[in-house]
């Protein structure tokens, strides 16, 4: 009851003190707008405002942008076309009509569609069908139109009005202005100025200004030795390699678990490149893990992670010798997560070996949409590989069935023909990588010899043609690996794409074009004095900033350096894409071993796949199986060549979200 007494004796006036007070906001919140803003922006009839322009009189005019030249040309072309479509020929007699028609045809053959039909007819009748006068009139008019200077429509800002001041002027001598010629990136001083033989370009900006001619990027000529400048590469090659076997690089591709590593491991063992002791060790270790069928695969899969997961993750290299060739085997990963590694290996290959699994259901899963059999074949063809050997592996799991072999061959033949391979450059070989049947000698299995009497796998490799090497071209070497050597400096591993490289040669490295001198050359762990196009070598470059060298950069000849740019035009073929390619579409650009983010900054034209004719200018998007000219822009400067100049360095691949969406050739460098 005590709490009831407290309520009865409560003074309510004390409790309501401050009840009507306002807390939590300022006095300005009671007004929706300040008086200054209201005076500037609200309409006041008393002030006599007559137009909306009074509200924005103090604001600057919005400057209009000039129209794009391409848009002006397209608009003029469209106007001329509409003029021609709406124009009707004048009514003339037969003779006059024949003269007029012949004049129009002859003028069209000279000027094309750039001039409207109305203009041609009027000019023809004006000069009484005199072709010389008609062409002079039309061509002079077109020349005058194109020669008009562009007028800048943007007005210059008005000069501020300053108050007049009266001051006593003191005569002063005119200031001396020293005019220095602007120095472009990577220019070397005159020979009169003493300079170090090794020029560091780590603080030198890269000259990536756009130009119409690619030779602008090679305008700067670096000093090289007299021997390097006058070297005859062809004579040197014949002197060094005349009595040696030809060298060829072969990449082994295919769907995951098709048996690529097992096939190559067994081939190496049968050819004597793997000792019995090493093979016995792999056999015992694989037995302990319950993976005895992987013992041949472990010859190439050397890392613990690859052996634990049972898949190849990086490109493994090995070497075999045939009667006439030295073959470098490149074992590519088959899993789709490691496609970038496969592309890096395929850029080094001359020929390819496609391994397919003949097991029921396995071939279908690898060949259907999303399988790596199809994607790998398209990738190697897009990267310039023309010769392909198809190995139908694990045919023993289906009892060496001829029907299964014929079924797989029929499906692959039609697909490979569409991918761009010639029938004469493709061969099909049945074998078993685990048992070694039909690898290095003729088949002995009766179930196979009943219907197959063709070549074994080693004979197929022996019959691959050696591609022509571009030895006479300037030096271009793509970098695939960088590591610390045993001596001073660090080593760069890569493939010599074109030209020749010798000891003590001076080279330019990457987009920075830092100059360095070759200290040592090794190939297959043997020292060399000269290496040539097609060789996989390691180069030691002392006194070089390692920050200027990255995987994917190009080593070039100082006399003809490789172009460096951030924007180029390419002719691409679009594969299956889920989202159409539009302007601003982000992609991953694959060029040799380089992986660089890029953007499709312009869709120039859609072109016909076979003829190359322009189907449509400036398309809005690119869909499946289309061919187009596009412009790509990278975030950093890269070294790249036109396909017409260097086929080896003019190919690019575009990938998005782990899927290859397009392949193309570089046609123009900005």
Swiss-Prot record:
Residue span of region G5: 432-434
Query: Where in or outside the cell is it found?
Result: Cytoplasm
- Catalytic reaction list: GTP + H2O = GDP + phosphate + H(+)
Q: What are the record keywords, sorted?
A: Cytoplasm, GTP-binding, Hydrolase, Nucleotide-binding, Phosphoprotein, Protein biosynthesis, Translation regulation
Q: Give the start-end ranges of region G4.
A: 393-396
Similarity field? Belongs to the TRAFAC class translation factor GTPase superfamily. Classic translation factor GTPase family.
Name under which the protein is recorded: Protein HBS1
